[in-house]
């Protein structure tokens, strides 16, 4: 028994009696039981929604394009995703909400790009900014889109500190204690040999375990005790006349000098400077009765997802890498729109094309670039011999 005829009318004979059939490519086809015509109907909006949803899932997933479309080459997926790269990525709204803590960090990516991230203490990514390196101007662009929080956690970048000093001078800064410990390990190594080095390493390791004000007070007392014991050690000097070879390597004059234990000094004065500025234990004192995050791990988790994306989808062009990273970041914003809502807004706005980041090309100098010359150069092994020069001077042949 065949399928019953529906009450839908045929577009050709205008009589009811259409039967639904399918096609190999998935399109819906109808067959009229009266005139025998086979009209078909497509839903571009439904097709686009399915492709766009698969596109976003591919960006956040670990499957290759060949695994997405079931082929070895992935050409079908690339063809279906080709228009998705042009959809503009929505920007996170500027809400003006004042957070207890904001985490700032930069992540260096391929194609000579760096992306600066800001994540709030409640979890969502608040904003991001593309740049070439972590400059103060780039961080100021990030800070301009947010209200000053109570505490901002940073890893110690010079550009970030300068931007905070100029833009948010009254905001309390919390230095990431993990980054402080890593800087100390770079100076001390993991197995210092001197007594001062071992004591500083113990202070650095204990710093990571401080969880309350009493432990912070004990740590600061131990730091003061270290200085009392190793004050003379830290001030020891080596004069150039005592070690001429090292002085030559350092570029010191014969009357010059340098600190003998400069790495130990660097670690101690790093502790002293950060403690004096209140950047070591701000997570305990900024909000009474509340313990905040003491590291930049929340924003480092987002950076890890970006690194994972680039590793799972190698070979992305510069433009596609930027788009993929921004789609990933948008998924971590507060209340991101669904794929259907994104496409609906995109169509209502006239389907605009995603704006590409312009490339800053180096301008030529007023004299212009150096042109190729024809003079012989020693680098090429081409120069006149002395005998030839003498013959040319005397006119002999």
Please report, for each region that a protein language model flagged, where it lies by residue.
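Short cysteine-rich clusters marking metal-coordination/redox-active sites
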Residues: 10-13, 32
């Amino acid at each position: 028994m065949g399928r019953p005829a529906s009450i839908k009318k045929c577009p050709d004979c205008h009589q009811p009696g259409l039967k639904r059939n399918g096609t190999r490519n998935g399109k819906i086809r109808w067959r009229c039981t009266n005139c025998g015509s086979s009209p078909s109907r497509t839903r571009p909006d439904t097709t686009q929604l399915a492709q766009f949803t698969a596109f976003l899932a591919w960006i956040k997933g670990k499957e290759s394009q060949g695994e997405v479309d079931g082929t070895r080459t992935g050409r079908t997926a690339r063809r279906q995703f080709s228009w998705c790269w042009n959809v503009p990525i929505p920007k996170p709204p500027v809400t003006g909400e004042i957070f207890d803590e904001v985490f700032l960090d930069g992540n260096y990516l391929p194609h000579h790009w760096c992306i600066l991230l800001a994540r709030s203490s409640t979890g969502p990514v608040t904003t991001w900014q593309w740049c070439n390196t972590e400059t103060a101007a780039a961080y100021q662009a990030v800070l301009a889109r947010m209200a000053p929080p109570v505490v901002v956690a940073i890893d110690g970048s010079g550009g970030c500190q300068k931007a905070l000093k100029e833009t948010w001078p009254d905001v309390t800064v919390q230095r990431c204690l993990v980054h402080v410990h890593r800087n100390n390990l770079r100076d001390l190594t993991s197995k210092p040999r001197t007594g001062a080095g071992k004591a500083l390493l113990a202070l650095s390791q204990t710093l990571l375990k401080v969880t309350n004000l009493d432990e912070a007070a004990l740590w600061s007392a131990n730091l003061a005790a270290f200085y009392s014991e190793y004050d003379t050690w830290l001030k020891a000097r080596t004069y150039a006349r005592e070690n001429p070879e090292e002085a030559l390597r350092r570029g010191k004059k014969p009357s010059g000098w340098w600190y003998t234990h400069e790495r130990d000094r660097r670690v101690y004065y790093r502790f002293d400077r950060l403690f004096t500025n209140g950047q070591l234990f701000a997570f305990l004192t900024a909000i009474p009765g509340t313990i905040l995050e003491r590291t930049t791990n929340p924003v480092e988790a987002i950076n890890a997802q970006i690194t994972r994306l680039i590793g799972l989808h190698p070979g992305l062009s510069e433009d596609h890498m930027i788009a993929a990273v921004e789609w990933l970041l948008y998924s971590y914003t507060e209340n991101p729109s669904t794929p259907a809502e994104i496409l609906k807004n995109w169509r209502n706005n006239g389907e605009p094309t995603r704006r590409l980041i312009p490339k800053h090309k180096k301008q030529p100098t007023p004299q212009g670039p150096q042109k190729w010359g024809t003079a012989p150069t020693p680098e090429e092994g081409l120069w006149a011999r002395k005998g030839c020069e003498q013959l040319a001077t005397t006119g002999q042949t």
